């Protein structure tokens, strides 16, 4: 965090598309000065969900550098202020900072990322106040349905791009089918937005897994930051669970997995959402981190480029590592894409002084980004468009302690695999 971005780094802006994108963004001499445009950005930068915000400073710093003196919209150059706020991994705090950005700072556009505990309260504030907003890094069902979204109506000013539960279910089943097990799945679903959506008996994992021939053992919801999972572990052992899945926050998975090892519970597969997205979360498990599997939304191997800079996913991730001395993380690409989408909408809006015009521009988005194509012309419900999802497994790395290998790409064959799912060690 806090590292500087240098857009003149050798090789980062080589792509011709990047040069064209920058020429369209950077002001020319003949452009008149426009009023400042304010963009609010909210994410969890501290607290148990801080891993999602680890790359924020790098991404935001890069966007600021790319914009230079401003964003050219028709014949005017508008200085752009990016107001970054920390949700502190708390829904109430997220709503509070969003309200201040809207009512006190008078932002023109809101960007928000990472888990329902941040995206939902911020999106709700924007919807109530008619503020254009784009969100991501949250499955679409917890974002849309938990906010009271109606498939035949949708929302007025809030839009979202990410994958859905149907995608992660498909990815997990595809990975599990490649390993011989008894098809008994133990579920760790917390009592939060993600856990309740994943465990929903009508729209979540249970009916889909049953249809695929898997038996689900659900010991019930548990509160985040639980320090004793003995009850769940005992249930899984009694029911002969060989696959564990769930969507715990990172510290809870660390607690569960270490206690499971201590108590002799050794499943063949552990496919966990949210908690295993980040290298440092896997490193916290020590040797027990080898073989963990998870959903993968973005990697340096993804075949996409930034519409702002022309940088490929590989170049972007490499620049992050050079600048921060840290391993890439999945939110890196999506946070950048949020700004790609937001700036593109502002450039196309009929008037930046008309919030309705900005909303209309968001709705009309048709943009190839660092995470793939974004267009709300098609989606499972109004205000939602989906991005590709694959499955990956953590293993010993060459230059890093653990590295990600894509092991399932059935739903996105344009993203290459690097191996097959390995069963976890049983001793």
Language-model features, listed with the residues they occupy:
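N-terminal secretory signal peptides
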Residues: 1-11, 15-20
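C-terminal segment of N-terminal export signals and the immediately downstream linker at the start
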Residues: 26-44
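Beta-alpha junction/loop-to-helix N-cap segments that form part of ligand/metal-binding clefts
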Residues: 51-58, 70-148, 222-229, 254
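Extracellular/periplasmic periplasmic-binding protein-like sensory domains
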Residues: 140, 260-336, 348, 407-426
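Solvent-exposed, acidic/polar segments of extracytosolic/periplasmic ligand-binding ectodomains
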Residues: 290, 365-427
């Amino acid at each position: 965090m806090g590292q500087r971005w240098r857009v003149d780094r050798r090789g980062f802006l080589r792509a011709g598309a990047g040069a064209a994108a920058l020429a369209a963004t950077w002001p020319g001499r003949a452009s008149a000065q426009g009023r400042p445009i304010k963009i609010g950005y909210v994410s969890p930068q501290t607290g148990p969900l801080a891993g999602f915000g680890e790359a924020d400073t790098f991404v935001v710093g890069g966007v600021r550098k790319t914009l230079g003196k401003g964003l050219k919209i028709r014949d005017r150059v508008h200085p752009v202020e990016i107001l970054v706020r920390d949700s502190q991994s708390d829904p109430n705090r997220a709503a509070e900072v969003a309200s201040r950005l809207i009512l006190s700072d008078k932002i023109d556009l809101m960007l928000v990322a990472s888990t329902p505990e941040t995206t939902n309260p911020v999106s709700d504030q924007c919807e109530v106040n008619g503020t254009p907003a784009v969100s991501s890094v949250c499955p679409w069902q917890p974002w849309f349905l938990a906010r009271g979204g109606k498939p035949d109506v949708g929302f007025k000013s809030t839009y979202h791009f990410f994958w859905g539960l149907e995608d992660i279910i498909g990815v997990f089943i595809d990975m599990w089918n490649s390993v011989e097990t008894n098809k008994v799945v133990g579920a760790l679903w917390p009592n939060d937005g993600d856990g309740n959506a994943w465990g929903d008996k009508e729209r979540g994992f249970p009916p889909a897994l049953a249809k695929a021939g898997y038996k689900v053992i659900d010991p019930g919801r548990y509160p985040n930051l639980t320090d004793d999972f003995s009850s769940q572990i005992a249930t899984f052992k009694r029911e002969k669970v060989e696959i564990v899945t769930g969507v715990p926050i990172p510290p809870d998975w660390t607690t569960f997995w270490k206690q499971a090892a201590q108590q002799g519970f050794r499943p063949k597969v552990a496919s966990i959402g949210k908690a295993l997205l980040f290298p440092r979360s896997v490193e916290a498990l020590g040797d027990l981190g080898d073989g963990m599997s998870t959903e993968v939304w973005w990697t340096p191997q993804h075949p996409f480029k930034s519409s702002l800079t022309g940088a490929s996913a590989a170049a972007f991730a490499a620049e992050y590592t050079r600048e921060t001395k840290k391993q890439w993380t999945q939110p890196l690409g999506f946070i950048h894409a949020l700004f790609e989408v937001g700036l593109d909408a502002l450039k196309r809006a009929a008037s930046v002084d008309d919030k309705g015009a900005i909303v209309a521009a968001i709705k009309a988005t048709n943009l190839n980004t660092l995470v793939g194509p974004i267009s709300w012309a098609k989606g499972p419900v109004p205000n939602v468009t989906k991005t590709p999802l694959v499955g990956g497994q953590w293993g010993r790395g060459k230059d890093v302690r653990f590295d990600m290998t894509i092991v399932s790409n059935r739903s996105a064959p344009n993203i290459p695999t690097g191996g097959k799912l390995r069963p976890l060690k049983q001793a």
